């Protein structure tokens, strides 16, 4: 008799030996068999999300079949089912396989090439701290690194400043070079592409420019929103994209917003940017922030107890960059005071932190509250569906301010306003943006509200 539980343990032991800890946790930790049909040999397996399902089907199912045949002489038929009980299935994905052992020769070649690419050596998958806000992006990035040009192409990672988009993007480059040291990887800021293009025209070196960008195996473009309103650049990048995509070369882009939100981005680029997968990174939750601080402290050789890490993490809920900045501030304060780092010292060091933080990420509820009080309505009305002017105008202003004062994407803002579509938020933003220039009453209200929210 085929014992599913024992076989699954056997298969997991095989995979644990093959993959490193990061990889194993990515695809096996939250995956389990839920049903086996002894007549058809169909094995139903529960996975966490669409990315995990796609990766198992493409990369792991054959290994599962081979393992079952070797274990029990049975040719199983794996069927993968997404866990519908997952609270946020679209966000729960973890990284994927990296082989633990690499030849020293490959490592040397990797390091030499990486230096020329200007990739940050710290930006690897092993150094990436995962949480609820970035699991899907991390899993997608790992899937791309494992099967470039075929899994999600292009991969479009979007989200606010300092949340780890560049880290994930460069980690893809690091992994490709670790596995294929001779691969041609090009990592650039979008401004670099613009400057290179302009210089190629000026110096009549367009052929060299196109050779650089159209013959690579992996193109990583950071902050693609910089292409907004640049028609000539968009035209050139379109042809670069077409060439790489048709040659099945991987393209990865980051942005602070969705392709549809980038102003004056050509329709054909918007279309192509959405061919693959678009994944959002959101601000880290408390547990993730503590994990980030703990890893940072260990890297710096700092001894900080859990209570102090918890306190620092509770003071910064915006992004990783500001979170690590808070730790640096605490460290500097401890050095100046010649004191050990503890909760009291951290409290003194960060006493003015809240005064200088910008309104971002998770503060849409505050904006709704201030706007509701200003217009003598309720947050429930702002989130509701009433179309009377007394509600519609405050709602649109609240959406406008949410877009202006936070790093939240349009879909996220729509979600905070009763699950409205992102196009509704876009319409509200555009309308208020225009009215500010022509309607003194609206302009005055927006100005007053900004002052109230920011102070």
UniProtKB/Swiss-Prot annotation:
Main location: cytoplasm
Region listing for Domain II, in residue ranges: 74-117
Cellular localization per UniProt: Cytoplasm
Pfam families named among the record's database cross-references: Bac_DnaA, Bac_DnaA_C
HAMAP family linked: DnaA_bact (MF_00377)
Similarity section: Belongs to the DnaA family.
Oligomer status and interactors: Oligomerizes as a right-handed, spiral filament on DNA at oriC.
Protein name listed in UniProt: Chromosomal replication initiator protein DnaA
Annotated organism of origin: Lactobacillus helveticus (strain DPC 4571)
Gene: dnaA
């Amino acid at each position: 008799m085929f014992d599913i539980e024992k076989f699954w343990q056997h298969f997991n032991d095989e995979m644990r030996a093959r993959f490193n800890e990061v990889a194993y946790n990515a695809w096996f930790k939250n995956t389990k068999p839920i049903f086996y049909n002894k007549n058809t040999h169909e094995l139903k397996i529960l996975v966490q999300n669409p990315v995990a399902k796609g990766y198992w089907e493409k990369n792991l199912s054959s290994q599962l079949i081979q393992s079952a045949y070797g274990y029990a002489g049975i040719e199983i038929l794996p069927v993968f089912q997404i866990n519908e009980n997952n609270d946020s299935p679209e966000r729960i994905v973890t990284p994927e396989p990296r082989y633990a052992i690499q030849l020293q020769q490959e490592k040397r070649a990797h390091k030499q090439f990486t230096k020329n690419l200007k990739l940050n050596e710290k930006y690897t998958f092993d150094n990436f701290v995962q949480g609820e806000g970035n699991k899907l992006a991390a899993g997608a990035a790992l899937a791309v690194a494992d099967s470039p040009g075929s899994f999600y192409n292009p991969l479009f990672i979007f989200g606010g400043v300092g949340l780890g988009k560049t880290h994930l993007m460069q980690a893809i480059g690091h992994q490709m070079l670790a596995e294929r040291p001779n691969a041609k990887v090009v990592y650039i800021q979008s401004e670099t592409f613009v400057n290179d293009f302009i210089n190629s025209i000026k110096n009549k070196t367009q052929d060299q420019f196109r050779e650089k960008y159209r013959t690579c195996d992996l193109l990583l473009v950071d902050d693609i929103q910089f292409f907004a309103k640049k028609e000539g650049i968009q035209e050139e990048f379109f042809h670069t994209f077409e060439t790489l995509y048709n040659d099945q070369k991987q393209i990865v882009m980051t942005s602070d917003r969705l392709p549809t939100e980038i102003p004056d981005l050509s329709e054909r680029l918007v279309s192509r940017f959405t061919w693959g997968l678009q994944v959002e990174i959101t601000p880290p939750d408390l547990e993730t922030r503590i994990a980030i601080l703990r890893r940072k402290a260990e890297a710096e050789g700092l001894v900080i107890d859990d209570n102090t890490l918890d306190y620092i993490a509770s003071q910064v809920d915006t992004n990783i960059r500001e979170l690590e900045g808070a730790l640096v501030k605490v460290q500097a304060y401890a050095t100046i005071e010649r004191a050990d780092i503890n909760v009291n010292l951290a409290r003194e060091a960060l006493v003015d932190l809240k005064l200088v933080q910008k309104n971002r990420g998770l503060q849409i509820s505050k904006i709704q509250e201030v706007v509701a009080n200003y217009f003598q309505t309720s947050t429930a009305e702002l989130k509701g569906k009433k179309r009377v002017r007394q509600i519609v105008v405050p709602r649109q202003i609240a959406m406008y301010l949410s877009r202006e004062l936070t790093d939240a994407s349009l879909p996220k803002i729509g979600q905070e306003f009763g699950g409205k579509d992102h196009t509704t938020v876009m319409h509200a933003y555009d309308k208020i943006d225009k009215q500010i220039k022509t309607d003194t009453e609206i302009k005055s209200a927006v100005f007053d509200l900004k002052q109230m929210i920011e102070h």
